[in-house]
Amino acid sequence: MAVQSKAFCAGGLAPGWKLLVQGHADSGEDRFETNFLLETGDIAFHIKPRFSSATVVGNAFQYGRWGPEQVSSIFPLAPGEPFEIEVSWDAEHFHVYAPEHKVLQFPCRQRPLGATTRVRVLSDHCLAQVELAKRGLSWGDRGY
């Protein structure tokens, strides 16, 4: 899998920010994941859409092992189609959205949240935009 994008979060993650990933699902292969990383090598949040099962999986890697997976059957990707995934977070949860859907809510298992200092997006699909930015106000029913 090719490394498409990396970002360093000076001071670590803080509530009020979001990660936006837009691209084109070139094939039906499971070759797309986003990882929120700590300096220790742990992964505070791992999100992986799985075309093979039409699910989105969330997990965390702590102390050398994966925790229990959280699986969502809301699948925002289709082969040959553009996609948009937004990840935001607060002190308690990571929130994953696709247009018109809340895909997943995953508990923050790593404390403190600010210990998460890097974001890495791995993908063999074509990514048009990967942006780490302050979240603006949103009017509508997206849940935030």
Swiss-Prot record:
InterPro entries: ConA-like_dom_sf (IPR013320), Galectin-like (IPR044156), Galectin_CRD (IPR001079). Pfam families: Gal-bind_lectin. Residues 5-133 form the Galectin domain. Keywords: Lectin, Phosphoprotein. It comes from the Eukaryota. PROSITE patterns: GALECTIN. Not detected in lens. The modification Phosphoserine is found at S138. GO terms for molecular function: carbohydrate binding. CDD domains: GLECT. The keyword Phosphoprotein applies. The galectin domain is atypical and does not bind beta-galactoside sugars. Homodimer. PANTHER family: GALECTIN, GRIFIN. This is Grifin. It comes from Homo sapiens (Human).
